[in-house]
Amino acid sequence: YKGVVAVHSEKTSYFTSSPSHSLSRPSVSEVVSVRDMIEFATDAEFKGTLHIAHISTKGALTLVKEAKKEGKIKVTSGATPHHALFNMEKENTYLKMNPPLRDEEDRAYIFSSLLSGDIDWVESDHAPHTKEDKEKGKCGIPGFKGTLLLLDALRENGMSEENLERIFNTNAAHAFGIDISPLPLPINTKEREEIAGNRYPFDPYAL
């Protein structure tokens, strides 16, 4: 098999009974899982691409960067808007997802790694729920507005339009062998952000 294997990396044996969602699924659960995935792919001499979806920790991303440098397997990673923009201090029932929000060091590292190109692409992780479901503890948030907010933030921090095009469009398309002619990324996003925020009965990015 020479295609893409995308993995959600959290090792459940490291989960705890903490009342905090972020602390109950600690960073180490992701780091150990990513380590194992890289080792499995390397030992199997995997010829495809191992993709680490919605990476959220500095430790896990460091392992991905080391594997890329070593060059024995092809490995990519993606990051979500919420893991790049919010830390666990913002955690509430509306900002609850898996993997959970991490501490500020992890968040800042994810954001800077998007800027540097060390993360291959942005993933919306779009998983909307009703307000009632969120108040019952369901995991997942709508990702459209967050994607626009992240686009703005990366632009404001000096990312070129060419590199934005890569991480929002072409890198993922190339990895999955999709031949597309992507639409230009929006420059004026404020109206779109308002529309996206109003599509749901609550806006987790405004809470």
Where do the model's predicted regions map?
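Histidine/acidic residue-rich metal-binding segments in metalloenzymes
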Residues: 1-122
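Active-site lining segments that contact anionic ligands and/or coordinate catalytic metals
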Residues: 72-74, 116-121, 171, 190-192, ...
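C-terminal cap of metal-dependent C-N hydrolases
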Residues: 139, 146, 182-207
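Short secondary-structure transition/capping segments
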Residues: 1, 54-56, 128-130, 165-175, ...
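Broad hydrophobic/π-residue packing in well-ordered secondary structure
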Residues: 83-84, 95, 111, 152, ...
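His/Asp/Glu-enriched, well-ordered alpha-helical/loop segment
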Residues: 21, 25-47, 113-185
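A broadly conserved detector of short glycine/acidic/proline-rich loop/turn motifs that flank catalytic sites
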Residues: 11, 81, 127-128, 206
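General structural signal for secondary-structure boundaries
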Residues: 11, 86-87, 103, 160, ...
